[in-house]
């Protein structure tokens, strides 16, 4: 089974937006045991789109096209594909009713071009759009490659693919072997060091396979196993995961494509019924914003402090003026007091503090990238950690936040 993915959109071609759909679809297909051989990108031009689709159909069994299903003049995908297949466009009654309701609710008159979103190539199976308006389609061609049409916005593509397209593909293309995969996420170790620690496993890999990926501020490993059924595949992954954890488990913070350090920390706090606050200087609320992006965080995070100026550290948190005068704001003493005072203010179990020099200029004789983190825990003496970071101002702030999260994660692991 050989598949090809085509992304449609001049804005992608010009680099104005990034094509995340192709990566998402490819991952989902791989887990379903469908191999992707080619990725293509084409602008909103009927002639060029026709050529790309014809080429794809000549060399692949399944062609998945995302984008170009909307109501505007440059949305040409379904018209182009219908013409290529020699079929008409027909209306999906349910999709049309949804479009009319949407306009009625908003008190607007529906323009005729919006009907395009409810059309699909005749002979296809329509795919309902739960989060948008443009209907998708799956056309099975007995004499050539099958074609699947998906909308362009990822917020529409992903639920449509997971809920409708993928089950349909699994039913259409049954397989004899089950493909299981697992993503391991690491922080605090570089790709080269991780690969070195696991070099024999990587060099000798057969089944499961190990694929390392260096991402921004972290490294992931994708483990993939082939087996007659899911249970045997998971067993293979469990055995390999245990071997990896025995070597580099200290850096392993979680699993899955959509996981994050913040999500792991928040879930651990929720599970253990512990609370957290923060006092931030150089990160200017970025740590609290990162926590706030995780659903359910309100159960463990009552609020926090952004104390950029020395006066705010003293007036809002109660950091002693003597500490600020003697040690400076970029110091272990200030980081500890920021953490302990903020924890006391909101009566939480933990608090993290961030103070330092994001750059580009030095501060108090300290170069850019000098960062002190403070950690206060109920019933314990506050601690401080010194970081020497490099990069842009935003990179230093982001790395500070992630290091703070990882420090908290490791601390929570020790809490009984």
From Swiss-Prot:
Cross-referenced PANTHER family: NICOTINAMIDE-NUCLEOTIDE AMIDOHYDROLASE PNCC, NMN AMIDOHYDROLASE-LIKE PROTEIN YFAY
Name used for this protein in its record: Putative competence-damage inducible protein
SMART domains reported in the protein's UniProt record: MoCF_biosynth (SM00852)
Recorded name of the encoding gene: cinA
Family per similarity comment: Belongs to the CinA family.
InterPro entries according to UniProt: CinA (IPR050101), CinA-like_C (IPR036653), CinA_C (IPR008136), CinA_KH (IPR041424), Competence-induced_CinA (IPR008135), MoaB/Mog-like_dom_sf (IPR036425), MoaB/Mog_dom (IPR001453)
HAMAP family linked: CinA_B
């Amino acid at each position: 089974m050989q598949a090809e993915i085509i992304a449609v959109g001049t804005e992608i071609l010009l680099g104005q937006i990034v094509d995340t759909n192709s990566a998402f679809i490819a991952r989902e297909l791989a887990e379903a045991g469908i191999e992707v051989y080619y990725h293509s990108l084409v602008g909103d031009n009927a002639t060029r789109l026709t050529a790309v689709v014809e080429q794809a159909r000549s060399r692949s069994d399944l062609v998945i096209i995302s984008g170009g299903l909307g109501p505007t003049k440059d949305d040409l995908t379904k018209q182009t594909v219908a013409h290529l297949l020699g079929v008409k466009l027909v209306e999906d009654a349910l999709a049309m009713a949804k479009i009319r309701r949407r306009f009625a609710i908003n008190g607007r008159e529906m323009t005729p071009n919006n009907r395009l979103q409810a059309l699909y190539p005749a002979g296809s199976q329509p795919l309902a759009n739960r989060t948008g308006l443009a209907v998708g389609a799956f056309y099975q061609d007995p004499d050539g490659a099958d074609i699947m049409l998906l909308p362009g916005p990822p917020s529409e593509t992903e639920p449509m693919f997971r809920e409708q397209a993928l089950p349909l593909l699994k039913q259409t293309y049954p397989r004899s072997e089950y493909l299981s995969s697992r993503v391991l996420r690491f922080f605090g170790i570089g790709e080269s060091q991780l690969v070195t620690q696991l070099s024999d496993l990587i060099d000798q890999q057969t089944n499961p396979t190990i694929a390392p990926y260096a991402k921004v501020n972290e490294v992931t490993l994708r483990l993939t196993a082939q087996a007659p059924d899911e249970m045997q595949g998971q067993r293979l992954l469990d055995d390999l995961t245990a071997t990896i954890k025995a070597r580099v488990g200290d850096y392993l913070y979680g699993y899955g494509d959509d996981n994050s350090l913040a999500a792991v920390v928040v879930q651990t706090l929720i599970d253990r019924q512990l609370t957290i606050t923060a006092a931030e200087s150089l990160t200017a609320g970025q740590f609290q914003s990162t926590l706030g992006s995780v659903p359910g965080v309100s159960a463990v995070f009552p609020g926090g402090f952004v104390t950029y100026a020395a006066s705010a550290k003293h007036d809002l948190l109660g950091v002693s003026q003597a500490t600020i005068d003697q040690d400076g704001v970029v110091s272990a003493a200030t980081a500890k007091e920021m953490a302990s005072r903020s924890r006391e203010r909101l009566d939480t179990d933990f608090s993290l503090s961030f103070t330092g020099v994001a750059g580009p200029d030095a501060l108090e004789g300290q170069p850019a990238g000098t960062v002190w983190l403070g950690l206060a825990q109920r019933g314990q003496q506050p601690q401080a950690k010194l970081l020497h970071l490099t990069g842009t101002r935003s990179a230093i702030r982001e790395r500070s936040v992630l290091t703070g999260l990882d420090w908290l994660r490791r601390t929570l692991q020790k809490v009984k």
